[in-house]
Amino acid sequence: MKLSILMPVFNEAETVQNAIKRLLDVQFPCPVEFVVVDDASTDGTSEILDGLHDDRLIKLRHAVNQGKGAAVRTAAAAATGDYIQPFDADMEYQPEDILELLKPVLRGEATVVFGSRTFGSHSAYSFWYVMGNKGVTTVANILFNAYIADLETCFKLMPLELYRSLDITSDGFGMEAEITGKLLARQIRPFEVPITYRARSREEGKKITWKDGVQAVWLLTRIRMTSKRAQRRGIPS
């Protein structure tokens, strides 16, 4: 098994070098590559990436900013691994936790694994932001008769070919809801493991907003309606 870690990067000059160094230092139990996509950064991120060298690094760049979802698609198109794991460059997630997601796959217990965050004392989010995340997750559980703990998590480990077959079209943060919704529509229930999470504040560069939550609910509803129509026609989701 080979793992491809996909890193979308946009204006993360303060954190990207440390994020990549931390990833490179992890002792993975399988061959690994790191596909980094600079989504047309303007803050010096590109120059920092140019100075990083490792045989496991694949560096790509968008000429125009397209969004996180588009950057992940670009990374997945270039990936050569059997499994993929997105990783944000802002260091809200811990690289070492990827090992926890790999364990149930390597034991043969799961095919898709999500890292479930806890919003505790290290979170910079407001009460309403946390409730928004939980609300979107609840909507998904109701629509698809499922029970998952954290729909919006970045930590989604799955086979590369499964990701490609989902045909994700969201260019921005909506990719998280689209991936989860399309998995649930196929009756694929992710195995979940707890992970460490330390949220950034708006002042530190957090980019996601309440509008992304509204979009997530819309995407989930659309996917569910499309899935029900396909089921009535006898077409696989």
Question: Which residue stretches match the model-derived regions?
Answer:
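Cell-envelope/extracellular polymer assembly enzymes that use nucleotide-activated donors
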Residues: K2-S4, E33, E178
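A conserved acidic beta->alpha catalytic loop
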Residues: D38-E47, M91
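Acidic helix N-cap motif at the loop->helix transition within catalytic regions
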Residues: E14-N18, D43-G51
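Catalytic donor-sugar/metal-binding loop of nucleotide-sugar-dependent glycosyltransferases
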Residues: Y147, T169-D171, G181-R198
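Acceptor/aglycone-binding surface of glycosyltransferases and processive sugar-polymer synthases
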Residues: V64-A78, Y83, P95-F173, A199-L219, ...
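Short, well-formed alpha-helical segments that are part of the catalytic scaffolds
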Residues: E12-V26
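Conserved donor nucleotide-binding strand/loop of the catalytic core
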Residues: V32-E33, S46-A78
